[in-house]
Amino acid sequence: MIDLKKYTKANLKPSVSELLPIFSLANPDVIRLKDEGLCALYKVRGIDSETFGSDFISYYADRLEDALKGLGENWTVSFFLIRKRNYYYPDIEFKSSVSKYIDEKYKERVLRNKNYVNNIYISFIYRENRSKLKIFKKVFERDGKKITEKVKSLSEKKTKEDVIKELKERLRLINKELEGIAESLPKLGLERLKDEELLAAYYFVVNPAQDLRQGGIRLPDYAFLDEYLTDFTVDADYEEAIKLDSSVYKVLSVKDYPQETYPGVLDGLLSLDKELKFSCSFSFLSKEKAKSLMKKRRRHYFVTRKSLLHQASETATGEETKLIDPTKMSYVYDTEEAMQELDLVRPFGIASVNFIAWGKAEKEAEETSAKITGVLKDRGYQVLTESLNKISAYFSAVPGGDKLNPRSFMVSLGNFVDYIPFRTILIGDKFNFYLKAPALCALETKHKTLFYFNFHVKDVGHTVIFGPTGAGKSVILNFLAAQYMKYDPQVYFFDFGYTAEILSLAQNGLHVDFKPEKRTYLNPVSLISKKGGKSFLRDFLQVLIESFGYSMDDEDLKQLWKAIELVASLPKNKHVLESFSSILPQNLSDKLRPWVTGEYKNYFNNPVDMLNLSKYTVFEMKNLSGANNSKVIPPLLMYLFERIDSSLSSLIPTIIILDESWFELQHPIFAGKMQEWLQTLRKLNTIVVFATQDLMHVAENQRMLSSVLTNVSTKIFLPNYKADTTDMKNLYINTFGLTENEFEMVITGTPARDYLIKQEHVTRMAQLSLDENITALIQSDEYARRLAKAIKLRGGDDWFKDYVEHFKKRTPLKEVEDLSEYFVN
């Protein structure tokens, strides 16, 4: 038995090994304890608090209770939540200098703020009745030898086979039990730890001020883990704290609990602006043992409901006093109610709850403990800081240390489940497993927990963004496009209002501004000699001919194909739209005339095609949005899509972005192409990201809606207070699958800051706050665009940095443009 009192003396610095309950590895995924117990440790993903509302959390708490209730009296289950500062940022070397600049500025802002991550672990401990375990001492006796050597030394003895057989059977039964629990709770994301990861996690739970050791802790050459894992001592020379390694720890215990609990009662700790550890343990009692303890408890409270003075008075006078302690009587009633629960086969056990704060100095630990105390008091708990029992309380909060806790209490499993920290704030994936690179970006949240965002969920990266004008669609599209350059991709951006022009200039990309009065220098007929070019040209010319209401019949299509074959045989300088005027039958030639010599001649009747797609290509579409240009959009999109399709390769990541896609969605050709893209482009390492201000444009097109719901892995909803109507609520919830909680976040979020991201396993209200160094590059007003073009004329790889400084100072255009003309001349 460990004498914990001696560690309260000043300046004692004993080895931690004597305090740890662990002894050796019984299996790669099982730790043997000093009291002969066996311990398995799991890392827990947890259930996201924003993804699931209170109804689901209550339901899952019942599921968790059902999964655990079959464990029985030999089991102890413990949960550990460790909230740690998170300094990880998804760094990568950008080839694009402007994307690197944006990332550096954004990283400075993100890391300037404190961010945290919640780590959750569960330990399961199985302890046999001690009378059955005496035989193990023959094998596990501490004499400095490896267990394998010890077993080998008993090779001629009968007990060796008995010991190994007994151990294997215990391990088999334990694993079977734990596998059943893990399978019944898939949303918890239980990951059984073993070998190096098991040791690293155990060390982390013991000394949480230290960071979790990535890559694990190497397995020892000898068996005794208590000595192997402790490279520091305990310093008890504090009244209400202990020092491990270089950190000072304070332990908080609960001395009184609220009358009512509910699942997630302690979720306030998940967003606390401090590092902390929260642990709770539950040791199952047999029904007989629980009933015996309850009877003793009831008898104690019933007897003490009257003070000694009143009891003496009753004895002396023979009259019963009516002065009864109401608190004690309430405890009597609570105990009677608990006994009724026990009769209903609801498990009871001995529970303990601890909270641990730390810092480099005692004052820092005290600040954290005060914050924890505030959260607990708000929920009706009374807490105290451990002093005399600080060491036993601290080491009771490690797997296997539950028996050391000085403040345990009996409680039903159902009530204990309310304390369990199975709810958390998921951080997303730090790594994009599909692209084999760091995550796209780290977004901040109100929980002070970064969310690592990726378009991809598994191998699907298609994304839709819904939000009204002014809610921040263009900002997030341009920011994510700049961040996507970390993967060295091709970017095709269909812009609507010049928001992407400055960034495309800074990327040394191509910006194509389609205007009715300007010649486009597009020549779709130049594709006639390419693979699949004739088939494309047949469909393209059919759209041109039918654009004024004519419907081509089979004979027309035959004549069109003949004309295509004939033009294909002509010299390349004759591969122009005008060549079809003299080859097609007169009726078809007349229908084609507006595109050759008439109103729309600037678009496709050009001697050469000068559209040389770049790594970063922007198509500005706003000037084609008028009714007079409605006939231009279908054939123009057809040609641009054909050029984009021909550039795609599974070897090069590609992102196609469509801002204000309602403009394109109103045309059947685009809607059909979008459905095709969503179904097929993932095989070509390509994702489509489209934004629209109106959900109805998607919802009213049943084929498009079905494709979005089936093939789009990421949906981003921007704040929209105008959506707080019955019809809009129905659209968000019943059509696009938001929960009541998620819809509430949409109508109450802050425009141009909050973005509700909904993916397969997580919903997160992320925040994107960009400083002026970045927003300067996403401006669409004439001043900013002229300023950027003028400064770019001066030359230099990093001209955009000068532009940002001039933009922030609002330098007059005349000063910059006059100087730029000097550089050009």
Q: What function would you assign to each model-found segment?
A:
Residues I476:
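Hydrophobic positions on the alpha1 helix immediately C-terminal to the Walker A/P-loop
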Residues V457, T469:
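The conserved Walker
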Residues A482-Y492, Q507:
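Post-Walker A helix-loop "phosphate-sensing" segment adjacent to the P-loop in P-loop NTPases
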Residues G509-V512, R703-F717:
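A short helix-turn-beta junction within AAA+ P-loop NTPase domains corresponding to the substrate/partner-engaging
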Residues K473:
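Conserved lysine of the Walker
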Residues I465:
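Hydrophobic anchor at the beta1->P-loop junction of P-loop NTPases
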Residues M1-I427:
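Extended, folded cores of ATP/NTP-driven motor/assembly subunits in large transport
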Residues S54-G70, K289-K296, Y381-Q382, S392-F451, ...:
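P-loop NTPase motor domains
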